[in-house]
Amino acid sequence: MPKLNKVTPFEQHDKRPKGIYILPNLFTTASLFAAFYAIVQSTVGNFGNAAIAVIVAAVLDMLDGRVARMTNTASDFGKEYDSLVDLVAFGLAPALILFEWGLQSLGKAGWLIAFAYVATTALRLARFNTQDSPSKRYFQGLPCPAAAVLLAAAVWTAESYGVTGTSFTVAGLVLMALLAFAMVSAMPYRSFK
């Protein structure tokens, strides 16, 4: 005799409005918009605006997870979507900003270090997504939003003081390489979740 699926009585179904599941993903989408804006601004030479957009993306990234936990709407879809957006916002956008601003003059070496930063961001995210953390209080490796904010803050600060990207080339190269290494290192970093 075939086994029948158990039917859940209507009164036991989740009564939350379906729209509440959209709320955390709206923050994630806003983070993606900020990353896209950062990329566009960097391609037209507005590096200060691009840097600020990456910082805005980081703030929105902090909020999407908190909103999902507060509203009890965390989902596998949301986790995957957040990770894809993180790669764009904290890997591609800051790498392109720094490349356009100061690494372009290095030719192949410039785009190789920028690509290495994007690749280590992807590796950091993949490790975070697949590895059970022994401690909720610490991350293994520098979180990619922190690395991106440090790069963006360096560009924004330099731009504010009139420092051009070409005079920041070596410092930018070293900073990007150090942050790329820190993301994939085994060093513990405190979590503020």
Region spans (language model):
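Topogenic membrane-insertion module of multi-pass membrane proteins
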Residues: 1-62, 186
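N-terminal TM1-TM2 helical hairpin plus the immediately adjacent luminal interfacial "cap"
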Residues: 40-46, 62-79
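Alpha-helical transmembrane segments of multi-pass membrane proteins
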Residues: 54-61, 116-124, 155-156, 175-186
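C-terminal ends of transmembrane helices
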Residues: 64-75, 122-136, 141, 181-192
